[in-house]
Amino acid sequence: MKTPKLFKQCISVFMVILALSAGCSKKSMSVSGNGGGSNSFKVIGYLPNGTSLSAGANQVDFGKITHLYVAFINPDSLGNLTGTTDLKAVAALAHAKNVQIMASIGGGGAPKYYPSFLIGDKKSKLIKDLVNLAVDNNLDGIDVDLEGALIDANYENFVIDLAAALRQKNKQITAAIATVYKDQFTDKALAQFDFVNIMSYDRTGPWRPDKPGPHAPYSMAEEDLDYWLNTRKIPREKLTLGLPFYGYGFGGNAPESVSYKGILKQYPDSINQDEMHLNGGMVYYNGLPTIRKKTQLAKERVSGVMIWQLLQDTTGARSMLGEIDGVIRGK
C-alpha cells in the first residue's frame, strides 16, 4: 500500500521533532556555566579570607568551579561581623563567571565565645546580620561550618531559624559536616540545608602525634559516603565529597601542615604518591591519582566535590583542580 506524499512529509517532520526532544532531554554533566543547577556536578572551593580577599580571588580559576565559599566571616566578641572587606567585589567577580558565592561561618578555629551567639538575643542579631550580609553583598547564601563543641544542643534551633530567614530572601544555606561528629547532627538540623559537604579528611593530624599516618585515605571517603548516604539517608543530590589540598607531617622536623603547592616546591615529582619522607619525618597527603580516584567516586555516588582550600593548589599540569576538572569532563 502506498503512503500519500503529504502524509510521508508529516511523518518525517514528526520524527525530527521526536529526535530533537530526545536530545534535549538527555542529562549532561557540566562543571562551568551552570551555577550549580540540578543536573550539574558541583565543584565547591573554599577561599581563605586573609589579608586581601580580592587578591586571593584573582588567583582562582573560576572556569573549573561552580561555587566559591569565603572562609570565614565571623562575629567579633561584640557581635559585629568581621572580614567583609572586598566581599561585594568578589561576589561580582564570581557571578560574572557564573559561579555562586557563599560566606562561610565558623571554621575549625572559630572563636571560643561562639556558643553565646547561638542562643537568645545574640542569636537573633547574628541571624539578622548574616541575612543582611548575603543580601547587601549579593551572595547566594550562607555556609555553616560549626564544628566540634559548637554542634551543641542549640545548633538545631540555630540552623532552623537561619534557614527560615535566608529563604525569605531567596538565599541558600549549606553546611560542612564531618563523620567524627555524626552523633551531634540531628536529622532535623540536616534537613534544613540545601546540601551538605562532607569534610572527608583530618582523620589524624598534629593534634594526634601518637597517631601518625594518612589523614584522608581513599577508604575514608568510601566510609564517609556509606554513612551519610545509607545510614543517615541523605539523598545523593544533597551531598558532596570533601578533598584536601594539603598534608600533615609527623616525626623529625617534618612540617606539621603543608600545602600541596608547598610539597611540590620541594619535591616536584611527588604528584603521584600520597606520602613522602621529609626532614627526618613523614608527610601524608593526597597525590593526583588519589584525587582523581576520589573525584570519580563522587561522580558515581554524590553530586559534587568540595575543596579545602583553593590557594593550596599549584597551576599547570600538576594542578589538583585541573585533575578534578579532567575527571568531570571525562578526560
Residue ranges and their predicted role:
Residues 2-11:
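Bacterial N-terminal signal peptides that target proteins for export
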Residues 20-23:
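C-terminal motif of bacterial Sec signal peptides marking the signal peptidase cleavage site
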Residues 25-27:
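Bacterial signal peptide processing site
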Residues 29-134, 213-214, 218, 226, ...:
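Glycan-recognition patch characteristic of GH18 chitinases/ENGases
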Residues 47-49, 72, 103-107, 146-148, ...:
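A cross-domain feature marking catalytic cores of carbohydrate-active enzymes
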Residues 68, 103, 144, 196, ...:
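Conserved, mostly hydrophobic/aromatic
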Residues 78-85, 128, 148-267:
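Substrate-binding surface in catalytic domains of secreted glycosidases
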Residues 236-301, 322-331:
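Glycan-binding loop/region signatures in secreted carbohydrate-active enzymes
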